[in-house]
Protein backbone atom coordinates (compact mmCIF):
# COMPACT_ATOMS: atom_id res chain seq x y z
CA UNK A 1 0.00 0.00 0.00
CA UNK A 2 2.77 2.43 0.94
CA UNK A 3 4.76 1.63 -2.23
CA UNK A 4 1.73 2.33 -4.42
CA UNK A 5 1.10 5.66 -2.71
CA UNK A 6 4.74 6.75 -2.89
CA UNK A 7 4.87 5.83 -6.59
CA UNK A 8 1.70 7.79 -7.23
CA UNK A 9 3.08 10.79 -5.38
CA UNK A 10 6.36 10.68 -7.34
CA UNK A 11 4.51 10.49 -10.66
CA UNK A 12 2.56 13.63 -9.74
CA UNK A 13 5.67 15.58 -8.79
CA UNK A 14 6.01 18.63 -11.13
CA UNK A 15 9.05 18.77 -13.40
CA UNK A 16 9.31 22.54 -13.35
CA UNK A 17 12.03 23.85 -11.08
CA UNK A 18 11.42 26.34 -8.30
CA UNK A 19 7.84 25.48 -7.38
CA UNK A 20 8.77 22.53 -5.16
CA UNK A 21 5.12 21.49 -4.51
CA UNK A 22 3.02 18.53 -5.50
CA UNK A 23 0.37 18.98 -8.18
CA UNK A 24 -3.22 18.15 -7.43
CA UNK A 25 -4.60 15.09 -9.20
CA UNK A 26 -8.22 14.89 -10.43
CA UNK A 27 -8.87 11.98 -8.07
CA UNK A 28 -7.94 8.37 -7.38
CA UNK A 29 -7.96 6.04 -10.39
CA UNK A 30 -10.28 3.09 -10.66
CA UNK A 31 -7.51 0.58 -10.00
CA UNK A 32 -6.44 2.01 -6.62
CA UNK A 33 -9.43 3.27 -4.65
CA UNK A 34 -7.69 3.35 -1.25
CA UNK A 35 -6.62 6.33 0.79
CA UNK A 36 -4.73 8.98 -1.12
CA UNK A 37 -3.05 12.13 0.05
CA UNK A 38 -1.88 14.80 -2.38
CA UNK A 39 -0.50 18.25 -1.77
CA UNK A 40 -1.43 21.39 -3.63
CA UNK A 41 1.14 24.01 -4.59
CA UNK A 42 1.99 26.31 -1.72
CA UNK A 43 0.38 29.73 -1.65
CA UNK A 44 2.45 32.46 -3.25
CA UNK A 45 3.89 34.95 -0.81
CA UNK A 46 5.26 38.42 -1.41
CA UNK A 47 8.84 37.35 -0.84
CA UNK A 48 8.67 34.49 -3.33
CA UNK A 49 8.90 30.75 -2.72
CA UNK A 50 10.94 29.66 0.28
CA UNK A 51 14.06 27.56 -0.16
CA UNK A 52 12.95 24.80 2.20
CA UNK A 53 9.56 24.33 0.57
CA UNK A 54 10.41 21.05 -1.17
CA UNK A 55 11.80 19.42 1.97
CA UNK A 56 8.76 20.48 4.01
CA UNK A 57 6.39 19.11 1.38
CA UNK A 58 8.19 15.76 1.33
CA UNK A 59 8.14 15.62 5.10
CA UNK A 60 4.40 16.32 5.26
CA UNK A 61 3.62 13.74 2.57
CA UNK A 62 5.62 11.09 4.41
CA UNK A 63 3.80 11.86 7.64
CA UNK A 64 0.39 11.61 5.95
CA UNK A 65 1.28 8.28 4.30
CA UNK A 66 2.52 6.95 7.62
CA UNK A 67 -0.72 8.00 9.33
CA UNK A 68 -2.80 6.33 6.59
CA UNK A 69 -0.84 3.09 6.90
CA UNK A 70 -1.01 2.94 10.70
CA UNK A 71 -4.72 3.77 10.99
CA UNK A 72 -7.26 1.59 9.20
CA UNK A 73 -9.98 4.23 9.13
CA UNK A 74 -8.10 7.56 9.18
CA UNK A 75 -10.06 10.28 10.93
CA UNK A 76 -9.42 13.98 11.10
CA UNK A 77 -8.54 13.80 14.81
CA UNK A 78 -5.97 11.03 14.17
CA UNK A 79 -4.43 13.00 11.28
CA UNK A 80 -4.12 16.14 13.40
CA UNK A 81 -2.59 14.15 16.24
CA UNK A 82 0.07 12.58 14.01
CA UNK A 83 1.04 15.93 12.49
CA UNK A 84 1.09 17.71 15.85
CA UNK A 85 3.38 15.07 17.27
CA UNK A 86 5.79 15.87 14.41
CA UNK A 87 5.58 19.61 15.15
CA UNK A 88 3.01 20.68 12.54
CA UNK A 89 -0.28 22.49 12.92
CA UNK A 90 -3.31 21.48 10.83
CA UNK A 91 -6.31 23.62 9.92
CA UNK A 92 -9.07 22.96 7.44
CA UNK A 93 -8.87 25.35 4.51
CA UNK A 94 -11.69 27.88 4.39
CA UNK A 95 -13.25 29.49 1.31
CA UNK A 96 -11.23 32.69 1.74
CA UNK A 97 -8.38 33.25 -0.68
CA UNK A 98 -6.11 35.05 1.77
CA UNK A 99 -4.54 33.01 4.54
CA UNK A 100 -4.51 34.46 8.05
CA UNK A 101 -1.33 35.80 9.55
CA UNK A 102 1.05 33.04 10.61
CA UNK A 103 -0.24 30.67 7.92
CA UNK A 104 1.11 32.48 4.83
CA UNK A 105 3.91 29.92 4.38
CA UNK A 106 1.63 26.94 4.99
CA UNK A 107 1.51 23.91 2.69
CA UNK A 108 -1.84 22.97 1.16
CA UNK A 109 -2.76 19.31 1.64
CA UNK A 110 -5.59 17.35 0.06
CA UNK A 111 -6.75 14.08 1.59
CA UNK A 112 -9.34 11.89 -0.18
CA UNK A 113 -10.80 8.42 0.17
CA UNK A 114 -11.08 8.49 3.98
CA UNK A 115 -13.08 10.02 6.79
CA UNK A 116 -10.56 12.88 6.89
CA UNK A 117 -11.17 13.89 3.26
CA UNK A 118 -10.81 17.55 2.45
CA UNK A 119 -8.34 20.39 1.93
CA UNK A 120 -6.06 21.31 4.79
CA UNK A 121 -3.40 23.89 5.46
CA UNK A 122 -0.30 22.50 7.21
CA UNK A 123 2.56 24.60 8.59
CA UNK A 124 5.47 24.16 10.97
CA UNK A 125 4.93 25.50 14.45
CA UNK A 126 7.70 28.09 15.07
CA UNK A 127 9.68 27.73 18.26
CA UNK A 128 9.57 30.68 20.66
CA UNK A 129 12.51 32.98 20.08
CA UNK A 130 14.74 33.78 22.99
CA UNK A 131 16.46 37.08 23.52
CA UNK A 132 20.16 37.08 22.69
CA UNK A 133 22.15 36.39 25.79
CA UNK A 134 23.96 33.71 27.69
CA UNK A 135 22.70 30.20 27.27
CA UNK A 136 20.93 28.86 30.31
CA UNK A 137 22.62 26.04 32.11
CA UNK A 138 20.84 23.09 33.55
CA UNK A 139 19.62 23.35 37.11
CA UNK A 140 22.13 22.18 39.68
CA UNK A 141 25.17 22.78 37.43
CA UNK A 142 27.68 25.62 37.61
CA UNK A 143 30.37 26.86 35.29
CA UNK A 144 33.79 25.37 36.12
CA UNK A 145 35.54 28.76 36.28
CA UNK A 146 33.11 30.23 38.79
CA UNK A 147 33.69 30.02 42.50
CA UNK A 148 30.83 28.80 44.68
CA UNK A 149 28.58 31.78 45.27
CA UNK A 150 27.86 32.76 48.84
CA UNK A 151 24.23 33.03 49.90
CA UNK A 152 23.02 36.51 49.09
CA UNK A 153 21.32 38.59 51.70
CA UNK A 154 18.94 41.47 51.19
CA UNK A 155 20.85 43.59 53.74
CA UNK A 156 23.46 44.64 51.18
CA UNK A 157 20.93 46.69 49.27
CA UNK A 158 20.03 48.63 52.43
CA UNK A 159 23.61 49.59 53.36
CA UNK A 160 23.24 53.38 52.87
CA UNK A 161 19.99 53.47 54.81
CA UNK A 162 21.43 51.37 57.62
CA UNK A 163 24.51 53.60 57.88
CA UNK A 164 22.35 56.70 58.24
CA UNK A 165 20.23 54.98 60.89
CA UNK A 166 23.34 53.97 62.84
CA UNK A 167 24.68 57.53 62.81
CA UNK A 168 21.36 58.93 64.00
CA UNK A 169 21.21 56.31 66.76
CA UNK A 170 24.74 57.15 67.95
CA UNK A 171 23.93 60.87 68.06
CA UNK A 172 20.78 60.18 70.05
CA UNK A 173 22.69 58.02 72.53
CA UNK A 174 25.36 60.70 73.01
CA UNK A 175 22.73 63.34 73.71
CA UNK A 176 20.94 61.04 76.16
CA UNK A 177 24.18 60.34 78.02
CA UNK A 178 25.04 64.04 78.21
CA UNK A 179 21.58 64.86 79.61
CA UNK A 180 21.86 62.09 82.21
CA UNK A 181 25.27 63.35 83.33
CA UNK A 182 24.00 66.93 83.60
CA UNK A 183 21.00 65.84 85.71
CA UNK A 184 23.26 63.82 88.04
CA UNK A 185 25.57 66.81 88.53
CA UNK A 186 22.64 69.09 89.31
CA UNK A 187 21.36 66.66 91.95
CA UNK A 188 24.78 66.42 93.57
CA UNK A 189 25.17 70.19 93.74
CA UNK A 190 21.72 70.55 95.33
CA UNK A 191 22.56 68.01 98.02
CA UNK A 192 26.02 69.45 98.73
CA UNK A 193 24.88 73.08 99.14
CA UNK A 194 25.88 74.29 102.71
CA UNK A 195 23.17 75.92 104.83
CA UNK A 196 23.65 79.54 105.91
CA UNK A 197 25.48 79.49 109.24
CA UNK A 198 23.76 81.37 112.03
CA UNK A 199 25.81 83.32 114.64
CA UNK A 200 26.61 81.33 117.83
CA UNK A 201 24.99 83.94 120.10
CA UNK A 202 21.59 83.59 118.43
CA UNK A 203 21.79 79.78 118.65
CA UNK A 204 22.62 79.92 122.37
CA UNK A 205 19.72 82.30 122.99
CA UNK A 206 17.29 80.05 121.11
CA UNK A 207 18.43 76.96 123.01
CA UNK A 208 18.15 78.75 126.39
CA UNK A 209 14.66 80.04 125.57
CA UNK A 210 13.53 76.58 124.43
CA UNK A 211 14.77 74.93 127.67
CA UNK A 212 13.11 77.60 129.84
CA UNK A 213 9.82 77.15 128.02
CA UNK A 214 9.98 73.38 128.45
CA UNK A 215 10.67 73.76 132.20
CA UNK A 216 7.76 76.18 132.66
CA UNK A 217 5.42 73.85 130.84
CA UNK A 218 6.52 70.92 133.04
CA UNK A 219 5.83 72.88 136.24
CA UNK A 220 2.40 73.93 135.02
CA UNK A 221 1.52 70.34 134.22
CA UNK A 222 2.60 69.20 137.73
CA UNK A 223 0.50 71.90 139.38
CA UNK A 224 -2.55 71.00 137.33
CA UNK A 225 -2.33 67.31 138.30
CA UNK A 226 -3.16 68.09 141.98
CA UNK A 227 -6.89 67.67 142.78
CA UNK A 228 -8.63 70.97 143.37
CA UNK A 229 -12.17 72.09 143.89
CA UNK A 230 -14.04 74.49 141.66
CA UNK A 231 -13.36 77.52 143.89
CA UNK A 232 -9.65 76.82 144.02
CA UNK A 233 -9.54 76.60 140.29
CA UNK A 234 -11.21 80.01 139.99
CA UNK A 235 -8.77 81.54 142.48
CA UNK A 236 -5.78 79.98 140.88
CA UNK A 237 -6.74 81.26 137.42
CA UNK A 238 -5.62 84.80 138.21
CA UNK A 239 -2.16 83.99 139.52
CA UNK A 240 -1.60 81.78 136.46
CA UNK A 241 -2.21 84.73 134.27
CA UNK A 242 0.23 86.73 136.37
CA UNK A 243 2.84 84.01 136.04
CA UNK A 244 2.37 83.70 132.29
CA UNK A 245 2.58 87.45 131.66
CA UNK A 246 6.35 87.78 132.20
CA UNK A 247 7.05 84.79 129.87
CA UNK A 248 5.50 86.41 126.79
CA UNK A 249 8.13 89.13 126.30
CA UNK A 250 10.88 86.53 126.67
CA UNK A 251 9.42 84.52 123.77
CA UNK A 252 9.18 87.62 121.59
CA UNK A 253 12.81 88.46 122.14
CA UNK A 254 13.81 84.91 121.11
CA UNK A 255 11.91 85.22 117.82
UniProtKB/Swiss-Prot annotation:
It is found in: Nucleus; Chromosome. It comes from the Eukaryota. One of its GO terms (cellular component) is chromatin. Keywords: ATP-binding, Chromosome, Developmental protein, Differentiation, DNA condensation, DNA-binding, Nucleotide-binding, Nucleus, Phosphoprotein, Spermatogenesis. Residues 142-152 have a biased composition (Low complexity). Testis-specific. Residues 124-134, 153-166, 174-194 have a biased composition (Basic residues). Coiled coil: none annotated. One of its GO terms (molecular function) is double-stranded DNA binding. The keyword Kinase does not apply. Its main location: nucleus. One of its GO terms (biological process) is negative regulation of DNA recombination. Residues 1-54, 124-255 are annotated as: Disordered. The modification Phosphoserine is found at residue 56. Residues 195-230, 238-248 have a biased composition (Basic and acidic residues). Essential for normal spermatogenesis and male fertility. Required for proper cell restructuring and DNA condensation during the elongation phase of spermiogenesis. Involved in the histone-protamine transition of sperm chromatin and the subsequent production of functional sperm. Binds both double-stranded and single-stranded DNA, ATP and protamine-1. Belongs to the histone H1/H5 family. This is Testis-specific H1 histone. It comes from Homo sapiens.
